[in-house]
Amino acid sequence: MDKNYNPQAIEQYWYQIWEQKGYFTPQGKDSSYCIMIPPPNVTGHLHMGHAFQSTIMDALIRYHRMRGDDTLWQVGADHAGIATQMVVENQLNAEGKTRHDLGREAFIQRVWEWKEHSGGTITRQLRRMGTSVDWSRERFTMDEGLSQAVGEVFVRLYDEGLLYRGKRLVNWDSVLHTAISDLEVISEEENSHLWHMRYPLSDGSGHLVVATTRPETMLGDTAVAVHPEDPRYQHLIGKTVALPLTDRTIPVIADDYVEPEFGSGCVKITPAHDFNDYEVGQRHGLPFINIFTVDASLNENVPERYRNLDRFEARKLVVADLEAAGLLEKIEDHKLMVPRGDRSRTVIEPYLTDQWFVKTAPLAEPAIQAVENGQIRFIPENWNKIYFEWMRNIQDWCISRQIWWGHRIPAWYDPEGKIYVAPTETQARQKYNLPPDLPLEQDPDVLDTWFSSALWPFSTLGWPEDTSLLRAFYPTSVLVTGFDIIFFWVARMIMMGLKFTGEVPFHEVYIHGLVRDAEGQKMSKSKGNVLDPLDLIDGIDLETLVTKRTGGLMQPAMAKRIEKATRKEFPQGIPSFGCDALRFTFAILATRGRDIRFDLGRIEGYRNFCNKLWNAARYVLINVSSEISVERQGKPEQAEENLMLGAPERWIISRFHSTTQEVIEGIENYRFDRVAQAIYNFTWNEYCDWYLELSKPVLNNPASPEAAKRRTRHTLVHVLEALLRLAHPIIPFITEEIWQQVGPLAGRQGKTIMLQPYPQPEIDKIDEDAVAEIEWVIAFVTGVRSIRSQMNIAPGKPIPLLLQAGKAHDRTRLESNQKFLAALAKLDSIQWLKDETPPPAATALVDELKLLIPLAGLIDKEAELKRLDREMQRMRKDLARVQGKLANSNYVERAPAEIVAKERQRAQEVTAALSTLEQQHAEITDLNP
């Protein structure tokens, strides 16, 4: 092994080997385990959420592969209708063309060409994360087989009356000219106004005041609503008002939707341009007047003065005309949530248009029952409640989009507008017995991307055909996804899976939080806090990082602020941490919370962990390899039980099996934070810090019996080899690299750690007596080291130790482990005191046993007192500063709560440290000169 751990030298090498050898493909065993990757957009790039999610999925897949399951991790990409079309349209714009210049067929061909040459970047980047997906089965939602499944589902839903075309309100993007899903709408708080307008009563008896944030929509009002029990307006219910700026009158209606205490208690109702008003309009049979064109200009349904104006220009004119007519009561400053398209950034309009819809209520009921009866389990379980709430209030699903890239809707229209639904035109003519000369025109719309991705768990396995893969791997085992798409994707997969296969699409749904920055802020380009996982793996210099963060901003004015913050946070750029360190960090952060705070300091710590494991392996190989090879010549390997293991060996083996039990429980319960913590604690705090140290007095002492050396070497190798298998699902690269040398020494056959059996806890090998004995040794050595640290005694200086009190087992353990204690605690003598008074000494306790280190002659009394005086003076100043802040009521009341809490914690820590120093000062003062 190389002296230094260099992840770049091993990670891409091993991934190439694994993929070439076909280790990622199913092996055809009896017990199957399958995960479907949430298909990333074909336009996408790997972000922290993808990297986190892929770490969890890969850990599960590697674990089950090592458990002997036939594993399939299905990979693929989503065609991402709107996003992909925008990318290609932007390319055309740069050439001075539009998609209409090319025509539909040529444009679609251009998109396919882009996909072949530039799409799929993210799937290549997933390789860098070590994902053991079956690349030979990579799928795309526009593949021929998947397209066949989409057509089949559409036709069957239509034939069963579960799919219809109708005029309903949708989220309309006036730049892209298409309906979009709620997930593609980003609502952000913005400064605006609230306009209060007067609507005169038709009988001339007065007026009603209504307030709106969108005054231009008043031209589409068809009622004013009041609460039925509001005494101010009960006498007006059924009367009419003259709609300002028009020649229409509209009724005053009563509806519980109105909140009497909000504003004037009167609400303008615009059913064609507000989702709540739409419901009110349906309840009361109101007219639906659409006042917008597809590009959000005002249409022929408004007075001529306002026609063809952009909505925001129309707003200004409407407000001016209301004011001129004396019908503008007041204007207030107002903050409101403005819905914008996540790609176009335009304000989204609720828009009444003909669309295709799925009737979801009949599909939702079985999907609710599947979770209620335990066929599907959400982890954590608290997501059940949110799932049920969404599903019991489900609305029909708008599945049509007014773009060209996607699965074209398999519906045809004759000249009279009659609809014929079938996978192809030929099949439509056969199905409906249409004459060959009847002209048919296919619906120009395409299906919502979520429609095809709802079929992902079974369409990728060959449905509607009854394939061997479908039989082997469906239902799949678990879905790993974020909480933000439970409704958009998870619920729809459950509905579609049950409807078309009769079975649930997966048995468990592991819902994880969203990766945020160290302050808990969402990572976004505009905030300048985005971290690219590949930059953490391979490193990036400062100038490249600045260019990356400031390029392509929606708001270029933010560039200077982002550059300044980036230079401050990363003055040297970002160093290379390697993939394993990033994966370990993600695992340790995989708690049950909604937010995953990513702190760069954590990944540095886990890079050090990988380095620790590497150095431990080098120590083992240097001290063990040649001797074990010699021992093996012509001899079968000795079993542990024949080696007469000592307490240190029985202790580390016990701790390994306890850790294995903890790790397996963690994986089975999706507590990867506990898995990583258990592996970390055992590796660093037990195997490296203690067992390796306990091995040195045996291996480095020529007088040690050969049997003791043999059992030590055997244990070093076998525990390390098993530890590598235990940690492999989380940190696959470093474990493979080390295992290639350690595995054969431990008698393991095979070409890769990936296909080795996962360790199983052997409870009969947990030796509580050995655990208690070595824990005593650790406490003993730690006590001596603590005194050294407190009294500023050099770590390597041999010192005498006095013992007092204690029990019989303390003497027994001392006798059994004296060579370890003397070596690890650097003791030149150990002496039991009887009843005599000990000399001035620093003391530590191991249960009732007193450890005493006489200080006379060990330290320079005067120099040490001066050092302590300086340190105490510094601490008292620090404490006074903190206490002064906390005594200031203005500071405590106005400073952020987390800052005040940190200062209080600081005060406690400094007080405790000062108390310790004062005690040390007193002990040293009492020493004889």
UniProtKB/Swiss-Prot annotation:
EC number assigned by the record: 6.1.1.9
Any one Gene Ontology molecular-function term assigned to this protein's record: valine-tRNA ligase activity
Positions of ATP binding: 525
Coiled-coil intervals: 855-926
Catalytic activity entry: tRNA(Val) + L-valine + ATP = L-valyl-tRNA(Val) + AMP + diphosphate
InterPro entries: aa-tRNA-synth_I_CS, aa-tRNA-synth_Ia, Anticodon_Ia_Val, M/V/L/I-tRNA-synth_anticd-bd, Rossmann-like_a/b/a_fold, tRNA-bd_arm, tRNAsynth_Ia_anticodon-bd, Val-tRNA_synth_C_sf
Keyword line: Aminoacyl-tRNA synthetase, ATP-binding, Coiled coil, Cytoplasm, Ligase, Nucleotide-binding, Protein biosynthesis
Cellular-component GO terms for this entry: cytosol
Enzyme class: ligase
UniProt record, GO biological process: valyl-tRNA aminoacylation
Presence of the UniProt keyword Coiled coil in the record: yes
One Pfam assignment: Val_tRNA-synt_C
Localization per Swiss-Prot or TrEMBL: Cytoplasm
Residue interval(s) of motif 'KMSKS' region: 522-526
Keyword Protease attached: no
Residue numbers covered by motif 'HIGH' region: 40-50
SUBUNIT field: Monomer.
Domain statement: ValRS has two distinct active sites: one for aminoacylation and one for editing. The misactivated threonine is translocated from the active site to the editing site.
Family matches, as NCBIfam families: PRK05729.1, valS
Function of the molecule: Catalyzes the attachment of valine to tRNA(Val). As ValRS can inadvertently accommodate and process structurally similar amino acids such as threonine, to avoid such errors, it has a 'posttransfer' editing activity that hydrolyzes mischarged Thr-tRNA(Val) in a tRNA-dependent manner.
Name of the protein in its database record: Valine--tRNA ligase
Species: Nitrosococcus oceani (strain ATCC 19707 / BCRC 17464 / JCM 30415 / NCIMB 11848 / C-107)
Annotated gene: valS
